[in-house]
UniProtKB/Swiss-Prot annotation:
This is Uncharacterized solute-binding protein MmarC7_0925. It comes from Methanococcus maripaludis (strain C7 / ATCC BAA-1331). Keywords: Signal. One of its GO terms (molecular function) is tungstate binding. InterPro entries: ABC_trnspt_W-bd_WtpA, ModA/WtpA. It holds the Pfam family SBP_bac_11. Belongs to the bacterial solute-binding protein 1 family. WtpA subfamily. Residues 1-28 form the signal peptide. GO terms for biological process: molybdate ion transport. CDD domains: PBP2_ModA_WtpA.
C-alpha cells in the first residue's frame, strides 16, 4: 500500500491497520527493507567529499549500497551517453558538461554545488621548489630537467583547464611565448589566435607529449602518487585536492586560476576544442554540477541522494571546496529539491 492509495482510501480503519503494520510511508519502508545499489559516476576531484556523502547516506539508509566510480568528468559523461552505462548520480567537475553533453536526451536538470580553482602543487623533492613563486613558475618550468604534469584534456576538465590557464598566462604576465614554450614545444596541441584577440586551443584526439618534460595521465588524481614519489616536479591541480593530500602549492593570479567570478571576462578570451569529440569549451569559473541521469535504474534514489548532498554543504567546505548554498538549479528540478535550490 503506498501513499497514493492511502489518499484514495482514507478511512480510519485502514489507517490504523497501516499504522500498526508500519506501511504508512512507502519511502520509510524502502529504507529498512529492500536492498538497493546506488551507482555514482563522479569526477576524481570529488573523491574525498563523495566518500563522506556515501557514509552519510548509507548510515541513514542501511539497505542502500552506494557504489562510486571515479574518473575524469568527460569520461564519466561518456559512460552514460556513449557506453550505455547507467548511474543514479552524475557529478562533474565542470557543470557545463551536463547541458552540453547530456541534455536533453540523458538529463533534463542539474544543480551547481561547489567551486574550485587551479593551483600548482609540488613536494620537497621538486626541483627548485624553494625558488618557485606565483610570478616565476612558467620560467622555472622551462629549466632543464624540470618536468610538469597535467591530466588529459580529452578525459578530464582539470586537463583542459590546465591548457586554458597556461594560455591565459600569456596575457596576465605579458609574455606571448608562455604557451608556446610549455605546451606547443612539448606536445601536439595547437592554438589559434583570432582577430578579436581570443584564443582557441586545439586538443587532438590522440595526444602526444614530450615525456622528458611532460607527465600526463587520464585524470588529475592519477597524478598524485607519481608526484609524491618524484616522477615529476610540478602538477596543475585543483586547490581542494592539493589541500586534501597535504601538498605544498603556489596559488595563481585570479586572472588565470579560473576561481574568481569577477574575472569571468578574462577567462572567456580562451577556449579549447576537443577535436575527437567535436566539443568546444569556453574558459569560465570552475563550478561543479550534478544530476540524476534520465536513464538511471532508480531515479528516485538518485533524487534522494542529491537531496542529502544539498542538505549538507559543509561536506564540501570541509573538503576545501567552497559550497554553493543554496545550490543553483537549472531545468526541470524534482519537487523534492525545490526548497534547497534557487533557480538560475
Amino acid at each position: 500500500m503506498n501513499k497514493k492509495s492511502l489518499n484514495i482510501v482514507a478511512t480510519l480503519g485502514i489507517l490504523l491497520v497501516l499504522a500498526f503494520s508500519g506501511c504508512v510511508d512507502q519511502s520509510a519502508s524502502d529504507s529498512t527493507s529492500e536492498e538497493k545499489v546506488l551507482k555514482i559516476f563522479h569526477a576524481g576531484s570529488l573523491a574525498v567529499p563523495f566518500l563522506e556523502y556515501e557514509t552519510l547516506y548509507e548510515d541513514e539508509y542501511p539497505n542502500v549500497d552506494v557504489q562510486r566510480e571515479s574518473a575524469g568528468s568527460v569520461a564519466c559523461v561518456r559512460k552514460i551517453t556513449e557506453l550505455n552505462k547507467t548511474a543514479e548520480i552524475l557529478a562533474s567537475a565542470d557543470y557545463t558538461l551536463i547541458p552540453d553533453m547530456m541534455m536533453p536526451d540523458y538529463a533534463d536538470w542539474y544543480v551547481m554545488v561547489s567551486k574550485n580553482e587551479i593551483v600548482i602543487a609540488y613536494t620537497e623533492n621538486s626541483q627548485y621548489y624553494d625558488e618557485i613563486t606565483s610570478d616565476n613558475w612558467y620560467e622555472i618550468f622551462q629549466r632543464d630537467g624540470v618536468k610538469y604534469g597535467f591530466s588529459s584534456p580529452n578525459d578530464d576538465p582539470c586537463g583542459y583547464r590546465t591548457q586554458m590557464v597556461v594560455q591565459l598566462a600569456e596575457t596576465a604576465y605579458g609574455d606571448s611565448t608562455i604557451y608556446d614554450n610549455l605546451m606547443l614545444k612539448n606536445s601536439n596541441f595547437m592554438v589559434d589566435e583570432n582577430a578579436d584577440g581570443t584564443y582557441l586551443v586545439r586538443s587532438p584526439s590522440t595526444i602526444d607529449v614530450n615525456e622528458d618534460k611532460v607527465f600526463m595521465r587520464s585524470k588529475e588524481v592519477d597524478l598524485l602518487g607519481p608526484l609524491e614519489t618524484g616522477a615529476f616536479d610540478y602538477l596543475f591541480i585543483y586547490k581542494s585536492v592539493a589541500n586534501q593530500h597535504n601538498l605544498s602549492f603556489i596559488e595563481l593570479p585570479d586572472e588565470i586560476n579560473l576561481g574568481n567570478y569577477a574575472n569571468a571576462d578574462d577567462y572567456a578570451t580562451t577556449s579549447i576544442i576537443l577535436e575527437g569529440q567535436n566539443s568546444t569549451i569556453l574558459a569560465k569559473p570552475i563550478v561543479y554540477g550534478m544530476t540524476v541521469p534520465s536513464n538511471a535504474d532508480d531515479y528516485e534514489e538518485g533524487v534522494s541522494f542529491t537531496k542529502m548532498v544539498l542538505e549538507h554543504p559543509e561536506v564540501f567546505e570541509n573538503s576545501g571546496q567552497p559550497a554553493i548554498s543554496p545550490a543553483i538549479a537549472i531545468g526541470n528540478v524534482p519537487e523534492e529539491l525545490s526548497d534547497l535550490v534557487v533557480m538560475g
